[in-house]
Amino acid sequence: MNQSTTIERGKAAGASPFHAGELAVQRRAGVAEHADAAGRIGIRGFMPEQHRAFFAQLPWFIVGGVDADGQPWATLRAGEPGFVASPDPVTLRVAGGALRDDPLADAWRPGAPFGGLGIELPTRRRNRVNGTVAGLDGAVLSVAVTQSFGNCPKYIQRRTPEPVAPAWPAVPLRRASALDEADRMLIARADTFFVASANLDPDAHRARGVDVSHRGGLPGFVRVDDARTLTVPDYNGNRYFNTLGNFVSNPRAGLLFVDFERGDLLYVAASAEIVWDGPDLAAFEGAQRLVRFRLSEVRRSEAALPFRWSAAEYAPQFARAGAAG
């Protein structure tokens, strides 16, 4: 029996990998038994070799964290493949890659929670890794892994990146308390966004920390209700409910919208409310529930992403679901 098998069996027989908020959502959705069985096997305390190799081949990496005020943010880092690496199964190293205007630029210190998502748009592969910052060495961030698990390829739009030189001179960061017309248009045509959430309750044990996840749909799946309110459908996923479970414990959320054509990054701080039923559900085909985000801050960093992407090839699930999350 190898070390990985020993770890897996010990974990499966031990405590649940989920915290109270995740368990509450699983029970309400009627999937608690399924999630418990799947989570005990699928959520590891180490990265398998396949994930370690996958992260090392990526030119970008989605990151979630919290700032000094406890606000979660979803952001990203970019670099030559290999800038994210893993010297051993329980350590992830991110060597630089921070972009200008990164809302988490000053957030990293030993013990800080870290959520990571490796996503490869051309192949629709994605894997998650969570942990805490173990150390800083200049621009290198070292993360001690507490949770590692894969996600299925559903709802990911296929795109191919092309590197570009950074825009110069850089346009100053725009900060506001509400969306302007350009922001609303970006969100209205978005087919992808990323969301960071957090549960920092010590009682959450190894489920404590930050999650950052992907959401995808056809353009218009994020409804702009007004300049400070967004409504998003929640569709069938892995049934772990990491993000929604965090919202039960802590409604603060950080959203990241990427303009794949221009390279703009739109960072949104918000408070999340889960809408379990009601007439609004009918407006979103196939939605099992909704999430309503009430915005408190908006930051737009123009042409910050050092890639431009090909037109989207939409995920095959949309032929059945219309939109998805």
Which role does the model predict for each range below?
Residues 1-325:
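Binding-site signature for planar aromatic cofactors or substrates
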